Amino acid sequence: IVFILGNHELWSFPSKTIDDITNIYRNIIEKNGMCFIQNELLHVDADNKIQKISCPELLQCNETELRMKLQRSKLVIFGGIGFSGYNDEFNADQGIYRQTIDRKREIQETINFEILYRKMVSVIKNKNTVILTHMPLKDWSKKEIFEKEFVYVSGHTHKNYFYDDEVYRVYSDNQIGYYNQNVKMKSFFLDSDYDIFSDYKDGIY
């Protein structure tokens, strides 16, 4: 089980920083044996062990180092809140975080997430990749371009949306909303194989 936060989880802590709030949830979730990510990456290695690469590590490592870390990964999950820095209609100015963060901080957090995402895109191709965010891609990415064969899972809008043509996969179709009493789980399929030579160019070695 992998958890991320949404804007509602920030409401009750107006005097705390995002890092403080994140750590409150992280401690509770991880104490109970589950996974939590905020601007971080989880990957399942060839031995089915769950590994995490922290935000500072993602920023520190170059692409070659990250590729080496993920070379034998069967599944990659990158994500976090995402934030709504690129949404001019529904953002911090409309109170979606209440008093916890303002529009300026929201934009900076969006940029922070987008920088990590852009850095990861070329590294995590062909890795059975899930991009797990609360906000949809258009809110946290300047370019609304979905990567081929990535699975994008998000919520926030309270409007269900599903698209899957086996190349582009966007799953925002299990949003509960405010008054839905019919809560259920959904699932999707990912291959569990990995290609250790995916970063090699065609040729003889």
What is each PLM-predicted segment?
Residues 7, 80, 156:
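Gly/Ser/Thr-rich helix-start
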Residues 21-24, 95-100, 189-193:
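Short, low-complexity, polar/charged sequence segments that are solvent-exposed and flexible
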Residues 2-4, 31-32, 74, 136-205:
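Conserved beta-sheet core of the metallophosphoesterase superfamily
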Residues 1-70, 144-146, 167, 173-175:
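Core catalytic region of metal-dependent phosphoesterases/phosphodiesterases
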Residues 132-134:
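Short beta-strand segments
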Residues 30, 122-126, 147:
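Secondary-structure boundary motif
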Residues 11-13, 44-47, 85-88, 139-140, ...:
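Short catalytic/ligand-binding loop motif for oxyanion handling, primarily in non-cytosolic enzymes
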